A protein has these predicted regions:
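Membrane-proximal N-terminal amphipathic helix
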Residues: 21-56
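Small-residue (G/S/T/A) turn/hinge positions that recur once per unit in extracellular repeat modules
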Residues: 111-120, 140-155, 178-184
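Short, hydrophobic/aromatic-rich segments at coil-to-beta transitions
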Residues: 76, 157-165
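Charged, amphipathic alpha-helical segments
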Residues: 45, 49-52, 59-62, 129-155
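N-terminal single-pass transmembrane signal-anchor helix
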Residues: 1-20
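Terminal alpha-helical segments
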Residues: 25, 37, 51, 80-83, ...
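Type IV pilin-like appendage domain
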Residues: 58-136
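Low-complexity, S/T/G/P-rich flexible repeat/linker segments used as non-globular hinges
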Residues: 167-190
């Protein structure tokens, strides 16, 4: 009986020790899927919105997107927005003071996870020095439009080939969501 109790105690100790890592990896992967689905929802709103017969401001053609900000004050949330302009020469952005973007919904990241970094990739490689990342979609194109605050001029945004959102957990581990210009999403992690 004493040996059985010792074996059960050892197994219980091992399970409880490994639970934090298991819980962290499951929650990170779940959040990565949630972010990917939020991006897909923004794309669907951009290209599949039904035109209202009475649409004086032409809002049918407004781009929709998601903004990610790894600054400490904002790293526990991300925001869906609508860019209230049909000017195709404007890069849809959120929160730069002059932007006609309207916040639609703010998603709060729970528990122990944060958006720890955002990166963009161009022909020169990956750049993680940007302050904020906006990924949006404009009718009739299905391709992703990127804006990296601190990346360069609005004309430089066309050079961005993909974007990465890095998600970290205080319990250990990280994962990421990558969106490329052809609107392909991929998830990964350590």
């Amino acid at each position: 009986l004493l040996i059985s109790i010792a074996i059960i105690g050892i197994i219980t100790g091992i399970v409880l020790t490994k639970y934090g890592g298991f819980d962290s990896s499951v929650l990170l992967k779940s959040l990565a899927y949630e972010i990917a689905l939020s991006l897909r929802e923004a794309q669907i709103k951009s290209v599949s919105v039904v035109r209202n017969g009475n649409d004086p401001d032409n809002s049918f053609d407004y781009p929709y997107g998601i903004t990610f900000d790894p600054a400490p004050a904002n790293q526990k949330k991300y925001t869906a927005f609508r860019f209230a302009s049909t000017d195709v020469t404007e890069v849809p952005t959120f929160g730069n003071g002059t932007s006609p973007a309207e916040p639609l919904e703010t998603f709060t990241i729970g528990r122990t996870m944060i958006i720890s970094d955002v990166c963009v990739t161009d022909a020169g490689g990956e750049d993680c020095s940007i302050d904020r990342l906006d990924i949006s979609f404009r009718r009739p194109e299905c391709t992703s439009l990127f804006y990296g605050a601190g990346y360069g001029s609005p004309a430089d945004m066309a050079d961005i080939e993909s974007a990465k959102i890095l998600i970290s957990s205080s319990l250990g581990g990280d994962t990421f969501v990558v969106e490329d210009a052809r609107n392909l999403k991929s998830l990964g992690g350590n």
